[in-house]
Every structure is written in C-alpha cells, then in structure tokens.
C-alpha cells in the first residue's frame, strides 16, 4: 500500500494545529491570572517596545523598501510605515490597555429565582483568537495587548509586506510579557508566509475560537467566505459625511477636510461627501479638498460647484478609495441623504454636520451603521479615540460586537447557578 506525500496544505494544517494547541494551553493559564499580573506584564511589554525602537524601525525600513520596490499603493505604504512617533503611539496604546479595567469576571447580571437559586451571567475570555492582517504592524501589538488583557491567546498571521516589522514587534512584546509571567505561547506569530497557513487557520474549527481579519476587501471577503470559525470583521469603509443646510460653514469645512485628508488610507476616512442643495457655501467645502490634492468625482449638481470636479461613474458611490479620491453628490435634504446612505453605505461610519438638533437626531436614529456621528470627523472611528485603548478591529455585523472591538468585544459569558439542593419537579 502506497502513501501519498504530504502536501503544503497538510504541512500548514499541522503547523496551525500545533500553534493552536499550544495557544489553548497558554490561554488556560492566562485565564487564571489575576488582573494585576496581566497589567504588569503588558506594562513591561510596552517598555520592551520602546527599548527596541532602533531594531523595530530598522526592520520596518526593510519592509518599506521592499514594498516600494514591489509597487505597493500609497495607502498600503502609509499603513506599513513606522516612525518614532508612530512606534511611541503603539507602545502607549499597549500601556493604555494595561491600565484598562479587566472585563474578565465582571458580573453582567444577577437574579434570584423564586426557588432560591441565584443566577449570574459572568464575562469570560473567548479563548484562542486568530488575527489575519495586512501591512499593519501596529496590529501585532494592538491585538496582542487586547487579547492578553482579556485573557485570550492570540495567533497572529501578518502580511508578507510587514514580515520584518511584525517579527521585531512580536519579539519585543513576547520578551516583555514573559518577564511579567505570561507564557510565550499566549501570543504566537505564524512563522511562515505561505498562504496555506491562512486556509488552515480558517478551517481550524474547535482549535481557534474566532478569526479577526484586518486588511483589504479581498482578504476580508476570502475570510468571510471560507472560514469555518466565527469571524468578526467589516468588509468596506464606505463612509459618508452629510453637510446639512443648517451646518456652521467653518465647522463643516474643517470636518470635511479632516475626514478625508488627515489620513486617506484608514478605514474611517470619508469616501463620499453629501451636500444639502440649500447649504449656503458648497464651494467652501470642495475648494480646500481640491487645493490639498484630492481628486473629486461628482454628480451633475456637484460638478456645477467647481469645474475641477470630474464626472462620477456609477461604481464610485460603492468604492472605498483609501486614497485622495472622494465622491461628491448634492442631495435635496435629509431624506435624500438618508436614501443615498442606505443604498451605498457599508455600515461602518457615517456622519452629519448640522446645527439643527432635530435633523441630527433623526440622522443618528435612522442611519444603520456601526458608528454614527454628529458634528465630528469620521476619522474618530477608532478604539483609542473611543477610550477603549487599542482596537482589534471595527465590526459591522449584527452579532456579538459592533463598532470598535476592544476588550469587551473579546469576551463572551457563562451562567453561574448557585443552589442549595434544589431539584426540578
């Protein structure tokens, strides 16, 4: 009887199974750790990141050079790039997570039954979480910190674009965590860039409890289509800002410019600007964008505002550009804005700029997105800006968690039932 040679997929499955079993063992230890122990370990991990600045930035420079040579887009390169300031921000985010309240063990609800039994619903970790991501070295630190603080083990599979950055960050993190008593297997980096490893993670039902993808549309779509493990994700960030007729012009101009141009490659960036037909200064909204180098694509009424606005194609309204391109439409009031958003939004973040509180309240109530804003830039769609510390991602689904997913979103719960000998009649 002949035996078939092992395939790449078989090898990847064996690799992921080994990582997951080690992660499960480490997670059981982590779940028993007192909150101060986890806090100290993460504080040490943040310090280790700061101490390894030179090594991490050198690794990132190698990734940036490779990315430029391989033709990565400006948006991807922006996500990949680390500077001393960005690295300091990553370390600060880890330290901030260390100081957050530990959700594990929180009593969500408690009730006494007529028969004397006492029921409690208590937060517990999800278990082993797989994070699959592209060109975002900050995710390595953010995900690790959030998982450890919430008692979960993490299996990290970063993109090939950031391979050197991820390894350097992971090395520093694990050293700091180990100094604080957290087993190294609690945060593991998949050691291969073979795509078969992604497939193995997606098929690891019973070994990995949840998958969180962070990356482009094709990655997230593949994860959602192929996973046999629950997925927490968003597919697109087609975010709208509606400037109502009542908006303060100075406020509207500042918010619109920031929402698009602060960082065009983040998932909270505005991709469509909706201008009320009776707003008094539409040119004051588009001119700063054009002057900043943003390409505008508009409908007929938008193009009448400024001749530099190009015609929009039908698919522009459904496009997440992640670069300095913006769709612009003029709408007849709130109802038409709501209809446009309902037709084209991805459920991520949508905003209104308005002085009329009744209009704003209706917008907040009727827009069905994970994050809905009034008089604020959509670039605030971020766990850190929400006071959650780092975030593991932004979820737009209906189940479990929506919006920025931080500590609470990485927990589930169990029921504790305390009796005194009750039997059921």
From Swiss-Prot:
NCBIfam families: PRK00197.1, proA. Belongs to the gamma-glutamyl phosphate reductase family. Pathway: Amino-acid biosynthesis; L-proline biosynthesis; L-glutamate 5-semialdehyde from L-glutamate: step 2/2. This is Gamma-glutamyl phosphate reductase. Catalyzes the NADPH-dependent reduction of L-glutamate 5-phosphate into L-glutamate 5-semialdehyde and phosphate. The product spontaneously undergoes cyclization to form 1-pyrroline-5-carboxylate. It comes from Novosphingobium aromaticivorans (strain ATCC 700278 / DSM 12444 / CCUG 56034 / CIP 105152 / NBRC 16084 / F199). InterPro entries: Ald_DH/histidinol_DH (IPR016161), Ald_DH_C (IPR016163), Ald_DH_N (IPR016162), Aldehyde_DH_dom (IPR015590), Glu-5-SA_DH (IPR012134), GPR_dom (IPR000965). The lineage of its organism: Bacteria, Pseudomonadati, Pseudomonadota, Alphaproteobacteria, Sphingomonadales. One of its GO terms (biological process) is L-proline biosynthetic process.
